[in-house]
Every structure is written in C-alpha cells, then in structure tokens.
C-alpha cells in the first residue's frame, strides 16, 4: 500500500474479527467464562509527496463490539460499542538504500491519534488524544525480507504510555 513515486497514493479496506473467551489481564484470567466479540472495518490511505515523505491515515469503524462483564450480583452485564474509532495520522520519513544484492529503508515516523467520539462505559478504542513516534528498519534480497519496528505512544488523559513492536521475516517463493 505504500507507493514510492511522487504524487502516488493508495488505500485499502480490511475487515477484522476479534473473539475472546475468559477475559484476561495479562496472562491472568480476570473474568473466566466471560467473552468479547468485536467486528471492525479498517479504512487506510497513503499519499506520497516524494518517495521519502508521505502521509498515512488509519480510521477504524467498529461495526459491533460486545463484552460480557460481571454485574456485581452474580450475573452478566453486556456492554456494547459501535462507531468510529480513533483517527491515526502518521508522517513516515524514509531513508532508502541500495546495496549489492540488498535494498531497504530506515523510517522515522511522528504520529498523532485523534479521538472522534466521546468516552462511554465500554470503549474499544482509547478515545483520548495521543502523540507517538515510530522507528523502523527493513531490507530485502531476491529471496528474503526482514523488518523491525517499534512505536511509542503517550496520551492526554489517564491512559498509560504504550510501546508496540514488530519483527517480520519473509521468504520469496518465486
């Protein structure tokens, strides 16, 4: 989805389903026997000014979210959520390299998260303003791909800071 030419753009839409049983807090069963089901449509787009500078936008729409919680008297309380999630905007700044048999890029990405709806009892998305920084490095050869990245977010509110990381490997079967 990342066009590398000046004036290039792209978009994608994808659907995500999340089903959870025995709601967890870390690895501990916080609410055994309770479940959560979430259906999300993700809208994502990119525009490239120059191959090194682009803007990305990610906007999720929660089609339906339902979570079972204890009601305090031995029963189940069902919480529901739907609607727009938080708009994420990023400005990936890339440095490309081409070496003998290997090419890739390093990325520095400032980000902002903008809440589009009000907080309620069950918020699948944060619904708090946030800023973040992302860093990444990836390279590929004729047969292999390697990527590593991390992002750090801080929020304006009660939500604690977060760090997300990924490590990706790939093989070209052609």
Model-predicted regions and their roles:
Residues 159-161:
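Low-complexity, polar/charged sequence tracts that form flexible coils or short amphipathic helices
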């Amino acid at each position: 989805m990342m066009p590398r030419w000046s004036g290039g753009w792209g978009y994608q839409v994808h659907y995500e389903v999340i089903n959870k049983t025995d709601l967890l807090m870390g690895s501990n069963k916080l609410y055994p026997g309770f479940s959560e089901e979430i259906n999300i449509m993700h809208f994502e787009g990119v525009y490239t000014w120059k191959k090194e500078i682009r803007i990305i936008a990610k906007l999720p729409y929660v089609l339906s979210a339902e979570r079972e919680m204890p009601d305090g008297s031995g029963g189940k309380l069902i919480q529901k959520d739907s609607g727009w999630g938080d708009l994420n905007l990023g400005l990936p700044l890339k440095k490309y390299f081409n070496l003998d048999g290997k090419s890739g890029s390093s990325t520095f990405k400032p980000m902002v998260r903008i809440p589009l709806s009000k907080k309620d009892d069950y918020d699948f998305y944060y619904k708090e303003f946030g800023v973040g920084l992302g860093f990444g490095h990836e390279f590929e050869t004729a047969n292999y791909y390697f990527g590593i990245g991390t992002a750090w977010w801080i929020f304006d509110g009660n939500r604690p800071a977060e760090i997300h990381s990924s490590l990706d490997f790939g093989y070209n079967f052609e």
